Each structure stands twice: as C-alpha cells, then as structure tokens.
Amino acid sequence: MSFEINWENLTSDSSINESLKEFLDRQFQNISLPSYIANLSVTNFSVGDIPPEITIRHIGDPFDEFYEDENDEGSSGPERVSSNSNMNTKETNYMSSDDEDDDEDNDLSTILSTIAEDSHLNSFSHSSTLYHSHEQSPPPGPAPTPPLLLRSRTSLDPISYIMANTSLNYLHNYNINNIGLGHAPSGTETPTTILNQNALTNAKNSRVISSLQKTTRGENDIQIIAEIEYSGNLHVDLIVNLLVNYPSPNFISLPIKLHITDIVIHSIATIAYLKKAVYFSFLCDINESTPDYFSTSSSSSVSTSTAAPATPTTYNSGGNFVDYIADPNNRERIDIVKKIKIESEIGELENNVLRNVGKVEKFLIEQLRNIIREELAWPSWICIDMSEDEDEEEQTPSPDSRDSNVNSI
C-alpha cells in the first residue's frame, strides 16, 4: 500500500523548520568539540520540497512506550518537537501466572500476516551500551531466538529483554515478509513482534507488559510501520570557527560556513498518532546491496558493512535472516543516513588550514550521523505536538466576542 503526502502543506509551515533547526542546534551544543574548532551552531534548516517515498508495511496500535512517554511528561506537556532519548525509568519486576499465559496462547495465531515483497532489513538497535550476560558462540542447528537489547529506559520494554542463554552480541537481518497488513491482538504489537521472525516465541513476554501498562487509548490512535525512501533536497547550514593553535592557542580564528545536502535514507520507521501528537522513530535500515532486492526468492543473500564487520552464518528456519557476530562496542548497528554531502565556504588560506577544513567536515558528518541515530533510532523517538495550534485557536476570541467586550466597556 502506498500513498502520497501533501508535502507542500508541511513545508509551508515555517515553524516546523524552525523547531527542527533549534532541536538540531541543541544537540550540536552538547557535543565535545575538538581543539581545532569552536562556536558550532546551526543557522538554517529546511526539509526541502521533495517528499520521501513511503510504502505502508503494517497498520496497528501504537507501541506502549509512546503512552508511557505521555504519562512521564505529566502536566508540563510536550514541546513542539521533543525527544525521549536516554530516558531512564525505575525498573519493576512482575510475575504472570501460567494459567493466564495458556489462555492467551490461542490469540498468537493472528499476530502477523506476510506480504509478497522480499527486502532484507538490518537489525534495529539503539546506540546505548549493550548488557552482556554471557559470552559464547552462536549455537548450531536451528535459528536461535533473535536477541533483544537492553535499553536505557527499562528492562521491561518490548525490545529490551535479556536472553538467558544467548549472547547479546548477535545481530540479525530480517526480511520484510515479517511485516504485513495483518492484525495482532490489540496492545501487543512491539518492534520485536513486528520485525522478529520468532515473534510467536516472545509474544508472551510482550503481553505481560501490555497487561501491566494501564493506559488510556484513544479510538483514533493509530500507528503505521512504513518503508521510507528519501533522496530529496533537505539541507542544513552550519557555521563554525576554525582555530589555528600555532604558534599559540587560538592564534587564528576563521569562521566557516558549511552546507549539508544530498541526504539519502532508506529505512523502516514507525509513525504513530495519538492524543494530538505524532511520534516518529526509525526501526531498522534496508539493505539494497543485493540485485534481487524485490524478488521473492527464498535464497538468502549475505552482505557485510563497515559498520558491523563479521562472519555471517545462515540458518534454515523458513525465513531469510542472517546472524552477525559484531563487536559489542560498535555503535553503528543502524546508520539511517546512507549518503550525505557537505560543502564548505572558506577564503584562500595556507595549506595547513585547508587540511583542517577536511577534518572539520569529517567530524561534523560523524556527529550528525550520531545525533540522528541516538535521537531517531528506536528506542528513541521524536514527538511533534499537534495540539498547540488548536489551543491557540480556542484562546483567540472571535470578532463577535471582541465587539461584545468593547460594548460592555
């Protein structure tokens, strides 16, 4: 299922570009800068006039974490554009009876349906530290249950269970056959059950969480799992001072204008609408390196990337997914940004200064990738509050009411 976005309505609202610019600028302000640059700031941001191509892969209920985020915000209310990254909550242990589990097992047959297209997906993960309970090699035989990573929010989150007998440093590639327009029991859908081939095995744990999170769900709440392919003209302008620290510190300070363009993204993302707010998060990347990207062949194509170099091992378990033994310290398990271009404006200077410009460009590209991963890759997300405009309209008196107020005076 595909649909068109009225991108013009989105770009016509200058407050969206301004909010995103301020959000990105705050993230850059929190970065520790190297000794050769200073005063980094974002001066302009534009989403551009070319919309992304979006294909719906799944429609269902919003993840419980989005409701949990609303409860955490309390009466203060969300910002226009806010982020939940690196949020910490108190962990609580719960137990469920075997009888309840047995009663709910009958509902698992409807958890997901499949679609015909076959696309290889990279594992989704947050850049926070993984907690390893065991160090062992991948087990032989049938495919093991894909690992569930412990995130910073709470160990009870749907994708944060610690596996008891499997090392957590095995990443998995899934094919898109696991994502369909099927129906799952209300409130049981999680990134794990949607993208995980062994969702039936882990759905019982998800139900425990769902039954414990008593949240008020609106009748209009909806969530879309979509494939997003973007190669538009979004651009970001930055300014930074290039420092020459010889023969003394800050001997020369030269402002440089940097233009970031040509951003390419091809990923699976979740878009949820609930209680007049839109939640957005990337779940995983799509690997386009194989020539039969949209074929329905059952053969598994394996490709490695610089982000997670490893020796792949394929298990025959009725689906195409690959185990990668990755460095646990490697943070680039989801890139989101596949391609990016940066240009700099600088006057004619000595060669040693020009060499530092290349270092600045490389540093900023790496930091921008890190910001996007840490703020937009699950289990982090951004929330866009859509209720502010409605509140302003309610507070603005109508012409008739203003006239009546004047007459009463």
Swiss-Prot record:
Residues 1-387 form the SMP-LTD domain. CDD domains: SMP_Mdm12 (cd21672). Residues 81-96, 396-409 have a biased composition (Polar residues). It is found in: Mitochondrion outer membrane; Endoplasmic reticulum membrane. GO terms for molecular function: lipid binding. Residues 64-73, 97-106 have a biased composition (Acidic residues). GO terms for cellular component: endoplasmic reticulum membrane; ERMES complex. It comes from the Eukaryota. Keywords: Endoplasmic reticulum, Lipid transport, Lipid-binding, Membrane, Mitochondrion, Mitochondrion outer membrane, Transport. PROSITE patterns: SMP. Residues 137-147 have a biased composition (Pro residues). Residues 64-106, 126-151, 388-409 are annotated as: Disordered. GO terms for biological process: mitochondrial genome maintenance; mitochondrion-endoplasmic reticulum membrane tethering; phospholipid transport; protein insertion into mitochondrial outer membrane. It is a peripheral membrane protein. Signal peptide: none annotated. Component of the ERMES/MDM complex, which serves as a molecular tether to connect the endoplasmic reticulum (ER) and mitochondria. Components of this complex are involved in the control of mitochondrial shape and protein biogenesis, and function in nonvesicular lipid trafficking between the ER and mitochondria. MDM12 is required for the interaction of the ER-resident membrane protein MMM1 and the outer mitochondrial membrane-resident beta-barrel protein MDM10. Component of the ER-mitochondria encounter structure (ERMES) or MDM complex, composed of MMM1, MDM10, MDM12 and MDM34. A MMM1 homodimer associates with one molecule of MDM12 on each side in a pairwise head-to-tail manner, and the SMP-LTD domains of MMM1 and MDM12 generate a continuous hydrophobic tunnel for phospholipid trafficking. The SMP-LTD domain is a barrel-like domain that can bind various types of glycerophospholipids in its interior and mediate their transfer between two adjacent bilayers. PANTHER family: MITOCHONDRIAL DISTRIBUTION AND MORPHOLOGY PROTEIN 12. Belongs to the MDM12 family. This is Mitochondrial distribution and morphology protein 12. It comes from Scheffersomyces stipitis (strain ATCC 58785 / CBS 6054 / NBRC 10063 / NRRL Y-11545) (Yeast). The lineage of its organism: Eukaryota, Fungi, Dikarya, Ascomycota, Saccharomycotina.
